[in-house]
Amino acid sequence: MGKKQSEAEILSSNSSNTSPATFKLVGFNNFVRANPKSDHFAVKRFHHIEFWCGDATNTSRRFSWGLGMPLVAKSDLSTGNSVHASYLVRSANLSFVFTAPYSPSTTTSSGSAAIPSFSASGFHSFAAKHGLAVRAIALEVADVAAAFEASVARGARPASAPVELDDQAWLAEVELYGDVVLRFVSFGREEGLFLPGFEAVEGTASFPDLDYGIRRLDHAVGNVTELGPVVEYIKGFTGFHEFAEFTAEDVGTLESGLNSVVLANNEEMVLLPLNEPVYGTKRKSQIQTYLEHNEGAGVQHLALVSEDIFRTLREMRKRSCLGGFEFMPSPPPTYYKNLKNRVGDVLSDEQIKECEDLGILVDRDDQGTLLQIFTKPVGDRPTLFIEIIQRVGCMLKDDAGQMYQKGGCGGFGKGNFSELFKSIEEYEKTLEAKQITGSAAA
């Protein structure tokens, strides 16, 4: 773990960073991708996503059922945790944790919390502002103390100093954007079930046979008020590099738009896109709508990789009206009639027909192909949603001779942005129409 500072020293030190160069968007056509291998600490992978919610039991079960992610571990009253209830659902390398507080009046010991950074008062403020939302994007790093100290030394705002969970696991957090934290976890041995303090969920209660083919988190997208300061802040303390860039001219519609930058780690398997709204369009940007309903910056959507998007979508759509997730409206038939001209022969006629039947969007870049689809918002507010994707192509061989897929293969759906915007705009119009009708009736 290396030499550690005291918690007071770490939390008070936020300083020796120099101001980065002024951020400026150049647009998709002028952007030149390069990987400077500039990470300031060793990042292994996305480890988990933590949601804060009012009811962890039922929210975790909905995501489990809707996404095909068995409930595998828990930390709650039954395990001795009197501070919060947390439930872990998992599919292959994708882990979601759902956390809700117990009453502080019944808490016997704050030391019983499995996630030591959890705060009941912080939760209540978070939930009142954001509703169901992502609290933490967790990265597995080689060394938590080194990652935290390197981040804070370069300007990261500390949220929770390094804590030793047991003699072989550590956790720390820094602020990312809004009320979202970037969590660092590391293990001195092979990781067990999850974090210390979690116990396995056995038997039929775990839905052990659920598997719709979802395998990992591809990217976690944040919406922010202003892109430049946030990009500079995150790049500054992580060392992550710009992987892709889009402006309103690249991806907007006649009615609304956004600017977007994707940040990536050295291996380009941890991808953090960031969006800002644009102004002066006919309609309010959907990014601005998000910021208003979320009361500030936050995670807009999570892109989940499927090994077979057709199977995943068939299973998810079966459950859309049975407690699962609904999807954004499908593109018009003309979208699929023109698909072969846009993406070539990478998909057969039968696969294109299946894309149309399931409402899947398809795009490609000079390296590979992307299949994608978006759910409607997963909670009461028009904020957080899920994207299901499959990337095709870009296969490489590692030093051990094993094949792997290059990160971000097929891009981020530049060719589908306008189609997605239209579908979101149509969805928002239905909400606005109801609000106008309700106001008139009142």
UniProtKB/Swiss-Prot annotation:
Domain of life: Eukaryota
Family according to the record: Belongs to the 4HPPD family.
Compartments where located: Cytoplasm
Gene3D superfamilies registered for this protein in UniProt: 2,3-Dihydroxybiphenyl 1,2-Dioxygenase, domain 1
Keyword Oxidoreductase included in the entry's annotation: yes
Binding positions (Fe cation): 219, 301, 387
UniProt keyword annotations, A-Z: Cytoplasm, Dioxygenase, Iron, Metal-binding, Oxidoreductase, Phenylalanine catabolism, Repeat, Tyrosine catabolism
Cofactor note: Binds 1 Fe cation per subunit.
EC class: oxidoreductase
Protein EC: 1.13.11.27
Name this polypeptide is given: 4-hydroxyphenylpyruvate dioxygenase
Domain VOC: 45-200, 216-376
Repeat among keywords: yes
Family annotation (InterPro entries): 4OHPhenylPyrv_dOase (IPR005956), 4OHPhenylPyrv_dOase_C (IPR041735), 4OHPhenylPyrv_dOase_N (IPR041736), Glyas_Bleomycin-R_OHBP_Dase (IPR029068), VOC (IPR037523)
Cofactor(s) needed for function: Fe cation
